Amino acid sequence: MGDKIWLPFPVLLLAALPPVLLPGAAGFTPSLDSDFTFTLPAGQKECFYQPMPLKASLEIEYQVLDGAGLDIDFHLASPEGKTLVFEQRKSDGVHTVETEVGDYMFCFDNTFSTISEKVIFFELILDNMGEQAQEQEDWKKYITGTDILDMKLEDILESINSIKSRLSKSGHIQTLLRAFEARDRNIQESNFDRVNFWSMVNLVVMVVVSAIQVYMLKSLFEDKRKSRT
């Protein structure tokens, strides 16, 4: 079994908020959005562990960017060790699960390959829906005295969450496009090398055949009779 890697929660930094909003900064819906690209050698297996809260939505997307066959075995297990997803010889996949408290394990297995390493990209997206309702309630105690503003605190929260959601989706799409571009570029470079190799082989064969033809034609016109003295 390969190395085990723990993926920590990212830290969300909030800046430039009015003082009245700072105590309620926890009201934003916490989310995780991270990606990772690594090389998995032939005959090896790599596992990652992600700690999860209760009643969260975890989305895992992976792609094989480079390597013969562009395929990999994928395994996702719950904190109790129950297999949630098991795929064999896949080039990509997307899976979403509702989580419970504990460490989720997901592995990429390249043991079926003896000579070809694989370049793998995966992305994790966690939407912690379990705490959203309580956090929205926590905001209400900061509403008093904010009516003097042109916008109420609920309106500010709604606008910020909307912007945050759209920025998150934009970042997710850009990450996927970069992954697609990397895989397509690797395929094109592989095709380019293959075309160059066989073009060189074809050129060598043509030169050899031409030389043989010239030799055979020349031999037809040679006078093989021996002159007597």
Curated annotation (Swiss-Prot):
The chain crosses the membrane at residues 197-217. Residues 45-126 form the GOLD domain. It is a single-pass type I membrane protein. It is found in: Endoplasmic reticulum membrane; Golgi apparatus, cis-Golgi network membrane; Endoplasmic reticulum-Golgi intermediate compartment membrane. Potential role in vesicular protein trafficking, mainly in the early secretory pathway. Required for the maintenance of the Golgi apparatus; involved in protein exchange between Golgi stacks during assembly. Probably not required for COPI-vesicle-mediated retrograde transport. Residues 28-196 are lumenal. Residues 218-229 are cytoplasmic. Residues 1-27 form the signal peptide. Its main location: endoplasmic reticulum. Pfam families: EMP24_GP25L. Belongs to the EMP24/GP25L family. This is Transmembrane emp24 domain-containing protein 5. One of its GO terms (cellular component) is endoplasmic reticulum-Golgi intermediate compartment. SMART domains: EMP24_GP25L. Keywords: Endoplasmic reticulum, Golgi apparatus, Membrane, Protein transport, Signal, Transmembrane, Transmembrane helix, Transport. The lineage of its organism: Eukaryota, Metazoa, Chordata, Craniata, Vertebrata. It comes from the Eukaryota. GO terms for biological process: endoplasmic reticulum to Golgi vesicle-mediated transport; Golgi ribbon formation; intracellular protein transport. Interacts with TMED9 and TMED10.
